A protein has these predicted regions:
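Loop-centered beta-sheet repeat module
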Residues: 173, 177-190, 197
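Hydrophobic anchor position in alpha-helical repeat solenoids
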Residues: 87, 100, 187, 240-243
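Extracellular glycan-targeting catalytic surfaces
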Residues: 13-173, 181, 248, 256-344
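Short, well-ordered alpha-helical packing segments
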Residues: 92, 134, 188, 241-244
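Hydrophobic/aromatic side-chain positions at a characteristic register within alpha-helices
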Residues: 96-99, 191-195
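Long, repeat-rich segments with strong aromatic
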Residues: 194, 198-282
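N-terminal export signals
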Residues: 1-13
Length: 344
């Protein structure tokens, strides 16, 4: 099932994974990315990295945005901190592609600042993009101090054990919806970085159980039934595809295992007519979650009106690297430069 040209099953890469060497991109894979990224895409990455070079760092002990409208409590400050995680990947990937030492230095600064004292809250919505910090770590780890490397791997272990634990933030439905998808993504990234086979096995078990419980035989997700929104179909599936991609980078075919019983491939096919623009959907009309109504009333963009199919761009680009049936759909959309490069 896997199209492994994009995610090679090199023996050396898998060996590194056992030792906790990387999350998604091994040293061999980094070379491959440099070779595959076009000059135009490299320019786009460089421009994105340049725009972030002057940013101040915003490490915090607590990051919290879940359930808050813009400007409520300290949400705005937490949004700045979450951008640190995303910028780590932008800067590290731009350095991988261009060799500009300023990008490397910025990525290293982010990692040093965050792993020095951050302890995960295990709220998978607040920390959904924390995985970007670890994806950036892949590219610059040889430039980090031994202490920072050790702290980053310890953070990965914390993410895995906490996300897979029995004590979980959120109401019971979060064990079935996108919250669990993000837990699985965070756990998978942390488990492979830790190099602990038991954690990897637990993450795989959680992944397969969640795919089975979240996606119906016809491909409809629990999130669509709960939220009546394509936005949440994408937000549910994208972290699962990232988890499957991380596993694939280590030679483990989670996507094929799940898709053999319908699973992810069925969900992607269910969404495809909407992503292609052949069908339209009015978002959140029958959502059972009260916060969705609050966001719509506050005119938060994307929480009312017709779904915009561009939201699925990154999802189908990632999917196309694991399953060739989705290449045409990925090509028809326009994934973000970071995603196109990361999965070049």
């Amino acid at each position: 099932m896997l199209m492994m040209a994009a995610l090679p099953r090199a023996a050396s890469a898998q060996d590194d994974g056992v030792k906790g060497g990387f999350v998604l991109s091994s040293a061999m894979r980094a070379i491959q990315i440099r070779q595959r990224v076009s000059p135009n895409l490299a320019h786009q990455l460089g421009s994105a990295a340049d725009a972030g070079l002057a940013r101040e760092l915003h490490p915090r002990a607590v990051v919290h945005t879940q359930g808050l409208l813009p400007h409520e409590q300290d949400r705005d400050a937490s949004v700045l901190s979450q951008e640190d995680w995303r910028q780590t990947l932008v800067q590290a990937l731009a350095w991988c592609v261009t060799g500009n030492p300023a990008y490397e230095a910025k990525a290293v600064a982010y990692i040093d600042a965050w792993v020095a004292g951050y302890s995960p809250s295990f709220n998978p919505i607040d920390e959904a993009d924390l995985v970007d910090l670890l994806l950036g770590f892949d590219f610059v780890q040889e430039r980090l101090s031994p202490s920072t490397i050790d702290k980053t791997r310890q953070l990965g272990r914390q993410m895995a054990t906490g996300s897979l634990g029995t004590r979980r933030v959120g109401d019971p439905s979060t064990g079935l919806n996108n919250w669990q998808s993000h837990r699985i993504k965070l756990a998978t990234a942390g488990a492979y970085l830790s190099g602990d086979p038991a954690l990897v096995a637990a993450a795989r078990e959680g992944f397969l159980a969640h795919v089975s419980g979240n996606i119906g035989t016809e491909g409809r997700t629990y999130d669509f039934n709960q939220r009546d929104a394509m936005h949440y179909v994408v937000y549910d599936l994208e972290p699962l595809m990232m988890a499957a991609s991380i596993a694939a980078a280590h030679g483990d075919d989670w996507y094929g295992m799940a898709s053999s019983q319908g699973g992810l491939a069925a969900a992607l096919r269910w969404l495809k007519p909407y992503a292609a623009g052949d069908k339209q959907h009015e978002e959140f009309v029958h959502s059972t979650v009260r916060f969705d109504a609050r966001r719509a009333a506050a005119h938060v963009e994307g929480y009312s009106g017709l779904w915009q199919r561009e939201e699925a761009s990154n999802l189908y680009w990632i999917a196309s690297r694991l399953d060739p049936q989705f290449i045409p759909m990925a090509s028809a959309l326009n994934a973000q430069p970071v995603v196109r490069a990361l999965f070049a």
